[in-house]
């Protein structure tokens, strides 16, 4: 069986009979070792390193996932966001939990809900796109783009925090500083810049920088990088620099200095004041050179692709003619908070244009792969691989050497990955030390081995993964059920509710009175068709439940057989265990009897010692002449030893003084004549004699110390 077939056979990926009728999603995190699979309003989660069986949670009490919803995952993989045009649900994936059958526990995992109809007053604008802020602490910030081009930040873990709305209309006459016709959003890979793709004039790129959550997740390396960039920009200011630019750069340096002061090194986070979160849009970016033939087309999507393990990235924009342009930000822009229509160093350089000859639906990047972009079309997924030149470009940037770019060809490799209809997303799966790409639609799920395309992992990471795997392997008896019992109970509850609920289609009383055989029976046929569809859905649910119960019964029979076999093995070892137990009992009894004898002797000895201690005979007995002589000798030896110690200390001080004098004399007598050299030789001889004397004294002290030790024993 191939690697992809074994991976497809994992229980977590087994589809129900109604799976083709509902959308399915797959996500991964922590280098592809944590997997989340969604189908039939059930979240399944599975840790490759620690779990032997996947776990599941039904969220149908809160929403019914249909084709109107989109699902995204946070970078950490801890949160899922499900949204449509009117509502947003954020749910926590219960990593570490195995039993979440209780309703109150299930409700606790829905941590945020937003509804336009409930929250907004006045004109309502539908939701266009939602992103998790990649640098928010505990994934607590989501960014929402609406049809009216406003961008809202929600703190999903703090209900008291009011949402921050950017790019609002100013409701005044004259030029409006906001950006209209925003079709897509994307964060930079450092998480501090939000790119906006504007289609008013075909395809302009704007940016919010900095775009910050209420609590910013920042490590020391990134913090120092921001500070260094700010210092370089500040030092580059001169008399010709615009006043507005100077003000923004100075404010940026002050802001970054505050980040350093308030940074929590333990948790790697820093609180951001509201005034620094109200950034103003800047741009548009210049694209040099811009392909002339694209002036007649409109941009559709924007994405950022990491090209190394640092922060060097490529900005990719797709157009409705099937073109991709790959751009590089060649200048460092400054932060802007209070200046409208601000433009400074908003520059992008065109590196390559890729023509795909088909309509592009979406662009997807995987954090585990560098320099690769997945392009989703109607029924095909393609990979654009530009590592052939991106690695050289990254090296030139890091080493500040542009010479290798002279003969470099900027040509990306285009490869067809698979032909699948309606691909909502894809994920990277790390299973059995193999890298796999999971491609999913409502009807199919395929895996492709991409181990040869992956970036090399560090030895330490591999060691930690293998260690964790070995730690999780136990010798105990393990169940081999492929589906958790709570998931079967959920299917049963859904089926029971469907059985007792009436049909959604209500037959008018007038139609009920009409005989079935009549010339105008189209209405009756339509009613019967709708009712039959409802019953077919219930039949599918019943079949799904029946198949699950059937498989469970077979697995339980198999488990019963395994348990009986294990029980028989244990019973067969009973005689050997009894014999060993009797032998060990005899040894135990012998040790107990010996211990009791020793305890008896010890008690007798303690009684004698207590009698001696209490006896007046020993208390009144005088010390003998020999004992007094022995104690006096010990006292004399101690005094003599102490005097030797003091003498040795004095000699050591003399020696150190002589050494210091020797050093001083050596420094002063670099240029001496013959006579001085003779005197120096005599001094050295004297020092050697003194050194011998000191050595003899040390030997005598050592001998006396040994004699003293011998006498005192």
Curated annotation (Swiss-Prot):
Motif range (Bipartite nuclear localization signal): 607-623
Segments of this protein annotated with the region Interaction with NUP116: 1-409
Keyword Membrane in record: yes
GO cellular component: cytosol; nuclear envelope; nuclear membrane; nuclear pore; nuclear pore cytoplasmic filaments; nuclear pore linkers; nucleus
Coiled-coil boundaries: 582-713
Keyword set, alphabetical order: Coiled coil, Membrane, mRNA transport, Nuclear pore complex, Nucleus, Protein transport, Translocation, Transport
Listed name of the protein: Nucleoporin NUP82
Organism (species): Saccharomyces cerevisiae (strain ATCC 204508 / S288c) (Baker's yeast)
